[in-house]
């Protein structure tokens, strides 16, 4: 059992709907539910509405609340986006699911494409929310069976990585806001003086790659680097492919391990490539704990860069140095180009 806070299945469903290309999301619940996720998705171009369930609606039913929110959202989107049939996700919350609201009630509304996702924060692992979103998309014919099975497999692998090697591997992981930044920079400065060779590995989750590619781009300025990246432009939903294309304009990859949504499995491919390289250091940016880095020669310097204060200890257990980029996801939403990272900017200054 995990006792520290974990991401919500509701939020995961919302981000997955974003990847599917929805114009808007209606949260069928109280106005404050998933507030941070809703606000961040607005930065990414998704309009977020709420059915504003209150105590009366919890007692007497909230169908009328949802109808009013849907009517307003459709009218708003048609006016603002000039779309005849906007795509709208309707996402459940703890409140609406506990009182048994029917999210599929309005799915046949011909004014919009409606994708209902019956989910709440007690549904289980956060990836359950994303899987439920894909189940609805499959049922409505928005994706095919092959893509659904692919997404389901990857989402389950993502959970497996976190439970075995990441933030869900222990009952409680203390957040750490200090990292090994100074030590890592000293090691890299020494390596530069020796004309050392570095393997740069981008193994990032979806759009976070806009930030996690940055320190690797900086390293390429000062070192002889071999670049490995999960930037396959032929894998994933359209948004995922576009993000990979955008990053490849700025970051040249010598080896491609898979798509941006395949980070739970591309780490193994990256390690197979690394085993055949003659390098002095390996820098992995994004989700470094998805790489079985323990299989690499112990004499090679290993630096892992990831997001969030609870990732430090899991990464430090398998890497020589762990770097934490705070709020990486929030910084990249709405962006379509490289976003500067804390480590990358300090590294650039230190290596000049």
From Swiss-Prot:
Q: Which reaction does it catalyse?
A: Ni-sirohydrochlorin a,c-diamide + 3 AH2 + ATP + H2O = 15,17(3)-seco-F430-17(3)-acid + 3 A + ADP + phosphate
Please list which residues make up the signal peptide.
none
Which Gene Ontology terms describe the biological processes this protein takes part in?
A: methanogenesis
Which residue pairs form cystines in this protein?
none
* InterPro entries linked to this entry: CfbD (IPR017675), Nase/OxRdtase_comp1 (IPR000510), Ni-siroh_cyclase_CfbD (IPR052673)
Q: Which cofactor does it need?
A: [4Fe-4S] cluster
The answer to whether the entry has keyword Transport is: no
What keywords were assigned to this record? ATP-binding, Iron, Iron-sulfur, Ligase, Metal-binding, Methanogenesis, Nucleotide-binding
Query: In Gene Ontology terms, what is one molecular function of this protein?
Result: ATP binding
User: EC?
Assistant: 6.3.3.7
Q: What class of enzyme is it?
A: ligase
One Pfam annotation, family name?
Oxidored_nitro
Q: This protein's superkingdom? A: Archaea
Record carries keyword Zinc-finger: no
- Subunit structure and binding partners: Homodimer or monomer. The Ni-sirohydrochlorin a,c-diamide reductive cyclase complex is composed of a NifH homolog component CfbC and a NifD homolog component CfbD.
Q: What job does the chain carry out?
A: Involved in the biosynthesis of the unique nickel-containing tetrapyrrole coenzyme F430, the prosthetic group of methyl-coenzyme M reductase (MCR), which plays a key role in methanogenesis and anaerobic methane oxidation. Catalyzes both the six-electron reduction of the tetrahydroporphyrin ring system and the gamma-lactamization of the c-acetamide side chain of Ni-sirohydrochlorin a,c-diamide to yield 15,17(3)-seco-F430-17(3)-acid (seco-F430), the last intermediate in the biosynthesis of the coenzyme F430.
Family under the similarity heading: Belongs to the NifD/NifK/NifE/NifN family.
Q: PANTHER family, alphabetically?
A: NI-SIROHYDROCHLORIN A,C-DIAMIDE REDUCTIVE CYCLASE COMPLEX, COMPONENT CFBD (PTHR42846:SF1)
> What is the name of this protein?
Ni-sirohydrochlorin a,c-diamide reductive cyclase complex, component CfbD
Instruction: Provide the species name.
Output: Methanocaldococcus jannaschii (strain ATCC 43067 / DSM 2661 / JAL-1 / JCM 10045 / NBRC 100440) (Methanococcus jannaschii)
The gene behind this protein is: cfbD
